[in-house]
């Protein structure tokens, strides 16, 4: 690799010290490197960490400084470029980032001599329908989450798989995740840890009001449809403003969201796009899990 683009979480590297350190190292080795924070100074751009319009067409690798969240946001926003990503963690080593600032030189040396592997991660497409109209669509690397929006009550919904009714749930919400997302919100909700390159779709209810409702794993090419129902199980117990607050929300990777109402259908399928992560670290996925225990 010779052509690099650096995306920086400005909250974790506010002065750009780490960004400049990486850029200087790459340039000293004869590589070409463009930093988004330098572009922002030139074009006075603010907002999200990454902007697909600013990425040069000859970029071979996007280096993301921050944490797992920054890497997820960059992979979503730059997915149309089909460029591999590598994460440099500023803080505690996560599940997705490959290295940190203490060992970045060794990692970049591996990239420069083409000594690396590519992990291909499945993504999800989600569409929200109100009647026959599609009102919202987005993609997710980790998960699509449907839960309550403020009110302290459970929500009711039906789940269909490939058009076949699965079950009716009363819960705080539901998480539809990829294998990559199995170590995110789904794990906190009691879901299993899954090898991240596995191709599948996992459905995990959030605090279900039943003892026998657990995570279910489906094939990658299955279609998951969630239909929102009236919150009958909780409406009788609610009074005042909470009773009138029926807002529920669908969130994609914690980044974008859309409020949903009774009758809305959220259809989730495997995306045609994938995220490609560069892997140079000798730390295996199992070792990362072991270090978290």
UniProtKB/Swiss-Prot annotation:
Pfam families, sorted: NAD_kinase (PF01513), NAD_kinase_C (PF20143)
InterPro entries, A to Z: ATP-NAD_kinase_N (IPR017438), ATP-NAD_kinase_PpnK-typ_C (IPR017437), NAD/diacylglycerol_kinase_sf (IPR016064), NADK (IPR002504)
Primary residence: cytoplasm
Assigned EC number: 2.7.1.23
Cell compartments where the protein resides: Cytoplasm
Catalytic class of the enzyme: transferase
Catalytic reaction(s) noted: NAD(+) + ATP = ADP + NADP(+) + H(+)
Cofactor: a divalent metal cation
Gene3D superfamilies hit by this protein: Probable inorganic polyphosphate/atp-NAD kinase, domain 1, Probable inorganic polyphosphate/atp-NAD kinase, domain 2
GO biological process, one term: NAD metabolic process
Transmembrane regions listed in the UniProt entry: none
Active site location: 68 (proton acceptor)
Biological function: Involved in the regulation of the intracellular balance of NAD and NADP, and is a key enzyme in the biosynthesis of NADP. Catalyzes specifically the phosphorylation on 2'-hydroxyl of the adenosine moiety of NAD to yield NADP.
Protein family membership: Belongs to the NAD kinase family.
Protein name: NAD kinase
């Amino acid at each position: 690799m010779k052509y690099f683009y650096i995306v920086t979480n400005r909250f974790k590297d506010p002065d750009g010290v780490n960004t400049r350190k990486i850029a200087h190292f790459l340039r000293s080795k004869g590589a070409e490197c463009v930093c988004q924070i330098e572009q922002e100074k030139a074009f006075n751009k603010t907002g999200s960490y990454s902007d697909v319009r600013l990425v040069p067409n000859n970029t071979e690798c996007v280096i993301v400084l921050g944490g797992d969240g920054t890497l997820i946001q960059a992979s979503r926003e730059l997915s149309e470029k089909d460029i591999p990503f590598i994460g440099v963690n500023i803080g505690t080593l996560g599940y997705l980032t490959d290295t940190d600032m203490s060992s970045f030189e060794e990692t970049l040396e591996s990239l420069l001599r083409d000594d690396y592997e590519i992990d291909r991660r499945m993504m999800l497409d989600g569409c929200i329908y109100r009647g026959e109209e599609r009102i919202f669509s987005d993609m997710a690397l980790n998960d699509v989450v449907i839960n309550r929006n403020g009110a302290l009550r459970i929500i009711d919904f039906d789940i269909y798989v490939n058009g076949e009714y699965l079950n009716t749930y009363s819960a705080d919400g539901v998480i539809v995740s990829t294998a990559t997302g199995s170590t995110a919100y789904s794990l906190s909700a009691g879901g299993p840890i899954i090898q991240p390159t596995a191709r599948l779709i996992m459905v995990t209810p959030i605090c279900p009001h039943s003892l026998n409702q657990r995570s279910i794993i489906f094939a990658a090419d299955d279609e998951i449809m969630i239909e929102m129902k009236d919150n009958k199980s909780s409406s009788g117990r609610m009074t005042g403003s909470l009773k009138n607050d029926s807002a529920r929300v669908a969130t994609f990777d914690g980044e974008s969201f859309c409020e949903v109402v009774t009758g809305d259908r959220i259809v989730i399928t495997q995306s045609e796009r994938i995220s490609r992560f560069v892997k140079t670290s000798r730390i295996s996925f199992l070792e990362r899990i072991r270090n978290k225990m």
